[in-house]
UniProtKB/Swiss-Prot annotation:
Protein name: Strigolactone esterase D14
Compartments (UniProt record): Cytoplasm; Nucleus
Region entry Disordered, spans: 1-48
Sequence positions that bind substrate: 147, 241, 297
Subunit structure: Interacts with D53. The interaction between D53 and D14 is enhanced in the presence of strigolactones. The interaction with D53 occurs in the presence of (2'R) stereoisomers of strigolactones, but not (2'S) stereoisomers. Interacts with SLR1 in a strigolactone-dependent manner. Interacts with D3 in a strigolactone-dependent manner.
UniProt feature, compositional bias: Gly residues: 36-47
Enzyme class: hydrolase
Outcome (variant: residue 297 to Y): Weakens interaction with D53 and attenuates strigolactone-induced degradation of D53
Family: Belongs to the AB hydrolase superfamily.
GO CC entries: cytoplasm; nucleus
Length: 318
């Protein structure tokens, strides 16, 4: 998901200032077990309950565009917001109703709505997704998730299999950290250095990370990703990264029943190609892998027409 070109500071800094605290900048060697049964429920730091469905539609800037009977949900990844889909959206709206929303951590969402305790694991993000679908009275959809949203979609489909006809997982990983018998792409010590760099100087880290993540030589894509990355409040960005890197979904992949399409670029700094093979072998639903002939973690920004062809092909068959 992230790497930094900047070395860690000589003396580690505490996590960035800002409301609620990021929960410290240390990574745990034992991954958090995400609850498949649900319930990020209420209470975070303020003890407030999760917003109602109607209120959530407003908070997360939910939009429904396009026409057609079939519904597609587009869910963006870390460091972006729903605008990341703008280049592929025209390829989908002619034949589908498309639901777009912002994750609560996105810079386009009022940061007062980010409850550090509630969003300390992915279950609360799953709650938000399911609440949106219920509020819109959507009985069935195809879900397209990028990076962390691929994880969210996997968990949501396990909790509510009736809702999800297909999952399209872009730059997906069930676990970003390496293990004794698994190559996720990152060592624990490496991630700790990234957390330290984010906490010490978020601007410097983001400036170095954006071109690495985009990968391909597409300056406009780097500029766009930089914009949304800088829109995130630094302490929220760090907290989200810590949450993602302590998550391990390998044990629940077999519970997925929806057919899946895993979309992988030829070189992704965040997700090795071996992870796509792992997902194909372990997801419970019928799974195919589509390799895009481009580099980078954000093909919807760097190669939108190429990704759109894969999406149209995948979404024509559900």
């Amino acid at each position: 998901m992230l790497r930094s070109t900047h070395p860690p500071p000589s003396s580690p800094s505490s996590s960035s200032s800002g409301g609620g605290g990021g929960g410290g900048s240390s990574a745990s060697s034992s991954s958090e077990k995400t609850m498949v049964g649900g319930g990020g429920g209420g209470g975070g730091g303020s003890g407030s309950a999760a917003p109602s469905g109607a209120k959530l539609l407003q908070i997360l800037n939910v939009r429904v565009v396009g026409s057609g009977e079939r519904v597609v949900v587009l869910s963006h990844g870390f460091g972006t917001d729903q605008s990341a889909w703008s280049r592929v959206l025209p390829y989908l709206t002619r034949d589908h109703r498309v639901v777009l929303y912002d994750l609560v951590c996105a810079g386009s969402v009022n940061p007062d709505h980010f409850d550090f305790r509630r969003y300390d694991n992915l279950d609360a993000y799953v709650d938000d997704l399911l609440a949106i679908l219920d509020a819109l009275r959507i009985p069935r959809c195809a879900f397209v998730g990028h990076s962390v949203s691929a994880m969210i979609g996997i968990l949501a489909s396990i909790r509510r299999p009736d809702l999800f006809a297909k999952l399209v997982l872009i730059g997906a990983s069930p676990r970003f950290l390496n293990d004794s018998d698994y190559h996720g792409g990152f060592e624990l010590e490496e991630i700790q250095q990234v957390f330290d760099a984010m906490g010490a100087n978020y601007s410097a880290w983001a400036t170095g990370y954006a071109p690495l993540a985009v990968g391909a030589d597409v300056p406009a894509a780097v500029q766009e990703f930089s914009r949304t990355l800088f829109n995130m409040r630094p302490d929220i960005s760090l907290h989200v990264c810590q949450t993602v890197f302590k998550t391990d979904l390998r044990g629940v992949l077999g519970m997925v029943r929806a057919p899946c399409v895993v979309v992988q670029t030829t070189r992704d700094v965040s997700v090795p190609a071996s992870v796509a093979a792992y997902l194909k072998a372990h997801l419970g639903g019928r799974t195919t892998v589509e390799f895009l002939q481009t580099e980078g973690h954000l093909p919807h920004l760097s190669a939108p027409s190429l990704l759109a062809q894969v999406l149209r092909r995948a979404l024509a068959r559900y």
